[in-house]
Structure formats: structure tokens, C-alpha cells
Amino acid sequence: MRSILLLLLALLSQAEMAPALTAEARYTHGVFYRDMQRQPVMQLKITGEPGEKITSITFTPGETSKPGDIKMVRLSSRDDWNGYTFNTAKYIHENAKGKFSKGKITFKQEYTLGSSPLYIWLSYDLAAGAVRNGKIDAVCTAINTEDGETTEPEVILADALEERKIGRVYRFPYRIVPYYRPRWVKGWGNAEKAVHLTPTHFNLFTDLIHFAYSVTAEGNIDYQWAGGGQSNKEVADEALEEIKRLHKEAKSKAKLIAGFAHMDGPMTTAVANPTTRRTMARNMATWAIERGYDGIDIDWEYPDSDEQWKNLGYFIADLREELSGSGISISIAASVGYKVPNYWTTDQLDFIMTMSYDDLTPDNHASMRLFQRDADICQNKFHMPKQKIVLGLPFYSNEQGKLTAQYGYSSVYNWNPRMKPDVNNCRLKNQDGTEGPMHTFNGPNLIAQKCRWAKENQMGGVMIWAYETDLPIKHKASLSRAMFKVLRQPKKKQ
């Protein structure tokens, strides 16, 4: 009798010690697109006693502006990774789908908990006519288990966030995204001949990347080199202040993105270690939130192996968790023909920007052929939706067959002021006045042609490297002038 009593007490003790089911909800994505399937809205992280069974999960559309824009609601899962990919057959498992009815949906889907956390993703298919800039939201109201218990997940937000920002449908039909180095914001180099930011620019492009930051191998945030013996921090901080002033003066709706680059060695080291990777994700998220950015762009040149690309994918998954509820976008710049893997990294991005230039072929370092090839790779190799493919334009020249001699477009033009708009190469003169090497670039006609192709093929837009080296926008030979005649920030919602 005593032994039976002891056994019952032991079983009761084990039951009391068994971990209760815990659930966390994170809003890891804040940018959504019209006419796109499997767009993640919420991540659930669930832990509990191994063997415990979940029998159903209920959601509502929360503060979604127009619930009717949600064509399909999907539930997916994975138990050993916190990232989401829409190519579900490879990396996560789509378990169920349905539609909201009377303001909710209950998935009667069974999950058995294991020793690792279970990650469940709620994703939406949005209608082609979804309201631009409309809110996209979800609330998990109940997670039910086999033993009759009901749990409502705790919403986890980014550490630096004071108030959650509900995700929104991207407000523009495409992106025009210049990179802008901080030392150019108030003038640098040949200031009277190069373009510099004015309020007008902020109502023409849709996003601006403040290309100012870097990282350390320990996962800390650093500043890029400012040049000229200036303080890296002061130049970057003053540039951000000026960018915000111009943005406000223009009453612009353009997004401001924090650009991280010049970090090959440190980035390689940091993302290879799970602890450092998470530290860097938290630091980067805090940095962007505290400074009021709308996005984070990573220009890592370059991950040189599949392992490094996979580590970048792990990092982006961690970064999304650390950005929970902020609405901040994540993008990368990539030479998409160079060791970029399918799905693992590219699926997690809000958009990718192709570096469709610096090609060593003899015709042009940034040909139309390369531009179209990169679009094809993103669509057919990475299976990326068109809305997420932003194609790169160069506003600079390369010496033919080399990458060691480059000049901004305004310099090339001012050395050859009689160039016609259809010219894409010229010989530069040496210092002694003799004929120098051939340089290739994109003239106004080719820039316009590329923009028309991107628009007609409904791509996600264009990115510009060396935007600040263009001629002033009112100049007849300005590349940005040619670009904005085809693609510009719409004055009204489209």
C-alpha cells in the first residue's frame, strides 16, 4: 500500500513539474504586396511537454483595413528553424488553408510537440486590388490542446519598440531605390557638377538607402569610412539629420533605409556563430528602430560559399524576430549570378536588389542583356515574385574589361560634353592629353530603355548605385531625369 502511495505521489510530482504549454507571437513581417501568395504575417513559437498535442488554433484578421483583401489564409510549420520561406515544399510544411468567416478562422490541425520549439506561421494570399498602404494584421486568440487547455500567445515586440506598427501593403506600384553615401549629402568632390539631394528628389524616388553603416565580428554596429580625415560618426549622423530634414520639407512618403556594407570579413565571422549572430540581429534592429528607419539593407560583398549564404539566411531569420512589430523591411543587394542559393535566403527578403553591373564582357559592364538575365535568375532560379525583384542601374563608368577604374557619370559627361543620349561608351583622355582607355556606362537612352522594360514586365522596380554622381536633375543629359520620365513616385495611389 505504501509503495502504491509513493508511486502516485511520484506521478503527481512529475505532472506538476511538466512544463506548461507556452506560446509567443511575433509580427516578423511588415511589408506586403498585392496579388502575392503566402505572405507571412505572424510567427508562433510554441513549447511544452514532449508528446503534448495541439488540436486547433484560432485567428482573427485584427486591424486589417479590408479583410476582404485576404483571399486565402494558410498555416505552415517547422520544428527546427525560426525562418519562413514561401517555397514550402523545400523548407517548411504547409498544413492547412482556409478563409476568414464571420471575423475568424479556426484551423483544426493537430501538432505534436517535441523537445524543440514548434514554429507555426500564419500567411496570407492578398488580392490584386488590395488597398495600397492598407493595414495587414492578425491576432491569435486561442491555441487548444488535447487535454482541453486553451492558451493565448504572448505578443513579443522588438526591444527598442515603444509601440507596435501594423504591417502595410506597399504603397507604390514599384520601387526606385538610390543608394546615397553620407559624405555626398551636403556636398563632396565636384559639388557644382554632381547631383545633391533636394526636397524634389524625395517626391521622385520611393526609397532612399542611407549607405552609412557596417558591423564588427563581435556583432556590434559600426560606421563606414567617411573619407577626407573626417569623423565617420559625425558625417553619417549629420547626413541622416539632413536627409530627415529634406524628407520632412518635401512631405515625402519615400521610405528611409539603413544601409550596412563594407563588412565581408566581420560579417562572415559574425553570422557563423549562433550567439554572435543573434547579438548582431538585436543590435541592428535596435539601431534601425531608434534612428527611425523604415528598412534595413545588407550589402555583403560577398558570401563566397553555400555555407555563408545559409548563415546569412539564419541571420535574417533572427533579425526578423528582433524586428517584431516594427514594420521594418529587410533587403539585400546581390550579384545574383554569384553563388546565391535558392530559397533559403531569398525567400526571407522583402525585396532583392540585383547588382546588374561590373560585368567584364567587352560590350558594356551593365548591358541590357545582363539586366534581363538577372531578372530571369530571380524569377526562374529563386522563384521570387516579380514584386520583390528590384533591378540595378549604374550611374558610373567602368574601364572596359576592368573593375579598377571607375568614374561617376557627371565626370564622364563633363569630359565629353557633346555625347549623344544613345552613347554608352567613350575613350577618356590621359593626363598628358593622349587618348586613354575605353570606358562603358549607361547613357540616358539605355537607362530609360531599362526602366521601360522593368515597368512593362511588372518588375519590382530599379535600384541605382552612384546616384549622387549624376548630373543635376534639370540637366538635359541627366540619367535620373531620363529615369524619372519612365519611373517615378506616383503622385496618387495607383
Where are these regions (language model features)?
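Short, well-ordered coil/turn segments that N-cap beta-strands
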Residues: Y174, L204-T206, K251-L256, G292-D294, ...
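Substrate-binding surface in catalytic domains of secreted glycosidases
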Residues: G187-W188, A217-E238, R282, Y302-R418
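Conserved, mostly hydrophobic/aromatic
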Residues: L208, I298, L319, I352, ...
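Glycan-binding loop/region signatures in secreted carbohydrate-active enzymes
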Residues: K386-W453, I473-Q494
